[in-house]
Design a protein with these regions (language model features):
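A short glycine/serine-rich beta->alpha loop
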Residues: 51-57, 93, 491-493
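A general alpha-helix detector
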Residues: 19, 63-69, 106
Length: 524
């Protein structure tokens, strides 16, 4: 008979950990992070927490704030469930939370209800602490923008112009209906006013008045097979239908506002834009946000979330935000050709900023010699002693009129000149396209600005700044998107998206700060 024996010994002894940091390396990111955050008064951002007199004790809000920021520092973007799971199994998060494990709902409440109002101030204070330690140069700001796809359905667009066209077609239907009603009421002496446009309030008032005139009761209305609606019922139901449609159109136009032409039904703050990475393969517009950053010494000094498709419209809000944070404007804002507009150059002149933003034709102007020296361009026409512009054939150009540029904040005007006589000109084929005398549009002020920008950017300093911008500003988005895997907005609504982008930017800056500190230690 086989003898069966059991071994009850356990070679693994129970170990009581005294301090979690004993298990962490001395250069561990969480220790660098904790020492740095200990120098900042975090409690002043947590004063708005409502007090509860019943229930379990609240989690330490300072520890929760540190845990959230550290999650964004290490992961680039961290979800609420990842935070909860990390507090259970990750020593770094256990160290920050002191072995407590808040649920993902608790983290969500903390971020949305407590951090949303103070995140911008927290971003500013952490940045200023980093910049003070790193002696960051804020006079040179490298600017870039990138479009991040919103968390919205792809085919959920609402177009402002299409809505306006539908509204005008509805106005025509309302006019026809009022004409029928007035014909119906011609013997009563009552008449509804007919306009080219109608407001929902007027339509609502007209419907109420129509009910009062005919003493209509909706409970007596008929519907379905075998029933014939009265004229009054049909007119009243049409009024109600048109009122509902008009309210819908008005709401859509109000959501779009003056600054954009579209929005998404599933995220009203998202605007449809063309994104560089067309993964759908059909050149389709996608709901997105335009995220702008100003980078100084590899740190994100200022960040802004916009609903504008063009980067030109984002420059002035970004500079004003920088001024609100630091109390001054950067001396050298360096940006690519998407930012070089008349409005932005005038803003720089008024606020003491140097013009280091390219304009749209900068590359062609500086690299294509044939284009730059082309004699038939209006900017290359000679000016005679009387100040008159003359073409290569010696013909003078006379000022016809001045035209205001649409949507220009500083009253920019274009001057329209026409040649005195182009008949029989040997250069006509190269100089003009039409049959009449050549007409040119000139803005001398903008031309001088372009020459100043070329002079700035073609200098040795300008070349170094351009190179640095491509490394730092574009490199920042490269790190965020490809190294730290934050490629798409998760939250919905402009305020929530701004909160999310601030957290990602804070995580990036803390991540950079830790890496630089480690490089200094390894060099020593």
């Amino acid at each position: 008979m086989k003898k069966i024996t059991h071994t009850y010994s356990n070679p693994k002894q129970a170990v009581l950990p005294i301090l979690i940091q004993d298990y962490l390396d001395i250069c561990d990111p969480v220790l660098t992070f904790d020492r740095f955050m200990g120098e900042i008064d975090l409690e002043k951002y947590l004063k708005e927490i409502p007090k509860h007199e019943v229930g379990r004790l609240r989690y330490n809000p300072v520890s929760m704030l540190k845990t959230i920021l550290f999650g964004f520092m290490t992961n680039g973007y961290v979800s609420l469930r990842e935070l909860e799971d990390s507090c259970k199994v990750n020593l770094r998060f256990m160290y920050l939370m002191d072995h407590e494990v808040p649920s993902y709902r608790t983290f969500g409440y903390f971020i949305n209800e407590i951090l949303s109002d103070s995140i911008e101030k927290l971003f500013c204070d952490i940045n200023q602490k980093i910049f003070e330690k790193e002696h960051t140069d804020l006079q040179h700001l490298y600017i870039d923008g990138s479009k991040f796809e919103a968390n919205a359905n792809k085919y959920s667009w609402v177009w402002k112009k299409a809505t306006e066209k539908s509204r005008y077609r509805l106005f025509e239907k309302i006019t026809s209906l009022f004409q029928e009603i007035n014909l119906e009421l011609q013997y009563t002496g009552i008449k509804f006013r007919i306009n080219t446009e109608y407001s929902p309030e007027y339509l609502k008032e007209a419907a109420s008045k129509y009910v009062e005139i005919w003493q209509l009761d909706e409970a007596t209305f008929v519907a379905g097979k075998g029933h014939r609606k009265s004229v009054q019922q049909r007119h009243y139901e049409k009024l109600k239908e048109y009122l509902s449609k008009l309210n819908e159109y008005v709401e859509k136009i109000q959501i779009c506002g003056d600054g954009r032409n579209s929005y998404s039904k599933t995220d009203h703050s998202a605007t449809f834009m063309r994104i560089k990475k067309d993964y759908m393969g059909n050149d389709q517009l996608l709901p997105a946000y335009n995220v702008q950053v100003g980078v100084a010494d590899e740190y994100i000094a200022v960040v802004d979330v916009n609903q504008y498709r063009s980067d030109m419209d984002c420059f002035i809000p970004l500079m004003n935000k920088f001024h609100d944070i630091y109390g001054f404007y950067p001396k050298y804002p360096v940006a690519d050709a998407d930012y070089g507009s008349y409005n932005n150059y005038i803003f720089c002149e008024q606020n003491g900023l140097e013009k280091y933003m390219k304009f749209p034709m900068f590359k062609k102007e500086t690299t294509d010699r044939n284009y730059h020296e082309y004699p038939f361009r209006a900017v290359n026409f000679k000016i005679d002693g009387d100040g008159k512009m003359r073409c290569p054939n010696g013909k003078g150009f006379h000022l016809q009129y001045r035209k205001a540029i649409k949507e220009n904040a500083y009253g920019r005007e274009e001057e329209i000149y026409q040649c005195e006589d182009c008949s029989g000109c040997p250069y006509a084929e190269k100089c003009k396209k039409g049959e009449g005398n050549r007409t040119v549009r000139v803005n001398q002020e903008l031309t001088k600005m372009h020459q100043e920008v070329i002079q700035n950017l073609e200098s040795i300093q300008g070349a170094l700044l351009r190179m640095n911008r491509s490394i730092q500003a574009e490199g920042t988005f490269g790190i965020i998107k490809n190294d730290r895997w934050y490629k798409r907005i998760v939250r919905r609504g402009i305020k929530s998206v701004q909160l999310e982008v601030y957290l990602v930017s804070l995580g990036h800056n803390l991540y950079k700060f830790h890496n630089k500190q480690m490089k200094i230690k390894s060099a020593a």
